[in-house]
From Swiss-Prot:
GO terms for biological process: lipid catabolic process. It is an enzyme of class 3 (hydrolase). This is Phospholipase A2. Its EC number is 3.1.1.4. GO terms for cellular component: extracellular region. It is found in: Secreted. Keywords: Calcium, Disulfide bond, Hydrolase, Lipid degradation, Lipid metabolism, Metal-binding, Secreted.
């Protein structure tokens, strides 16, 4: 779901800023 995607992305962003989101997509 969209909420789950956002949750995973935010969690990954907090752990690894400027690296990867919850789905392994590169985030700047």
């Amino acid at each position: 779901s969209l909420a789950n995607f956002l949750s995973m992305t935010l969690t990954a962003a907090k752990r690894k800023p400027k690296e990867y989101d919850g789905y392994g997509n590169y985030c700047g």
